[in-house]
């Protein structure tokens, strides 16, 4: 099994900053935006985007945490650890996750989101898009496009969970 670091901490920070600038450019009314991090690492990426938006625009956007597990079609989990302290009805919600792969986690997160309210618009920001979609889902904001084979794995590490920031590709062959 071979592991190769493809994004270091500096490159990750730049990708998050780029996503933040794109959010600013594409959203005319930032005061109507709610950030929704998809557990686990998407929550920490959402917090970083929230911090950058505060630094750049002086805005304190609300942030929520979506747990997609109870809404997945490939596992049964009863406990829902979603934390959404703001009413999302009529809001522009930006889902934030670490890796976009098949699209199934995003579908589950959207199901969770619409169970909480009716947002005006939902968009998606991901740190890494690796391709191989099984559902017709695409990201609106992408930090890095990293094409992979179906046997390779992308691992995103964030300092808040893993002690360091990096993205690695693992080749099991």
Curated annotation (Swiss-Prot):
A GO biological-process term: DNA-templated transcription termination
Enzyme Commission (EC) number: 2.4.2.9
Primary enzyme class: transferase
Catalytic reaction list: UMP + diphosphate = 5-phospho-alpha-D-ribose 1-diphosphate + uracil
MF annotations from Gene Ontology: RNA binding; uracil phosphoribosyltransferase activity
Pfam families named among the record's database cross-references: Pribosyltran
Keywords: Glycosyltransferase, RNA-binding, Transcription, Transcription regulation, Transcription termination, Transferase
Gene3D superfamilies to which the protein is assigned, alphabetical: 3.40.50.2020
Motif, PRPP-binding: chain positions: 93-105
InterPro entries reported for this sequence: PRibTrfase_dom (IPR000836), PRTase-like (IPR029057), PyrR (IPR023050), PyrR_bifunctional (IPR050137)
Assembly notes: Homodimer and homohexamer; in equilibrium.
Family according to the record: Belongs to the purine/pyrimidine phosphoribosyltransferase family. PyrR subfamily.
Protein's job: Regulates transcriptional attenuation of the pyrimidine nucleotide (pyr) operon by binding in a uridine-dependent manner to specific sites on pyr mRNA. This disrupts an antiterminator hairpin in the RNA and favors formation of a downstream transcription terminator, leading to a reduced expression of downstream genes.
Record's protein name: Bifunctional protein PyrR
Native source species: Streptococcus pyogenes serotype M49 (strain NZ131)
Lineage of producing organism: Bacteria, Bacillati, Bacillota, Bacilli, Lactobacillales
């Amino acid at each position: 099994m071979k592991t190769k670091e493809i994004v270091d901490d500096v490159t990750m920070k730049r990708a998050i900053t780029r996503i933040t600038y794109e959010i600013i450019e594409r959203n005319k009314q930032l005061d109507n935006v709610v950030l929704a991090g998809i557990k686990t690492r998407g929550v920490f990426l959402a917090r970083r985007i929230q911090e950058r938006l505060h630094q750049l625009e002086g805005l304190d956007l609300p942030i929520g945490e979506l747990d997609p597990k109870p809404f997945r079609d490939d596992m049964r989990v009863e406990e829902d650890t979603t934390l959404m302290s703001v009413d999302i009805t009529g809001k522009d919600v930006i889902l934030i996750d670490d890796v976009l792969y098949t699209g199934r986690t995003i579908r589950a997160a959207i199901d969770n989101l619409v169970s909480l309210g009716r947002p005006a618009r939902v968009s998606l920001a991901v740190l890494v898009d690796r391709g191989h979609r099984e559902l017709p889902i695409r990201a609106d904001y992408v930090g890095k496009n990293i094409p992979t084979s179906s046997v390779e794995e992308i691992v995103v590490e964030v300092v808040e969970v893993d002690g360091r920031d990096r993205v690695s590709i693992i080749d099991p062959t």
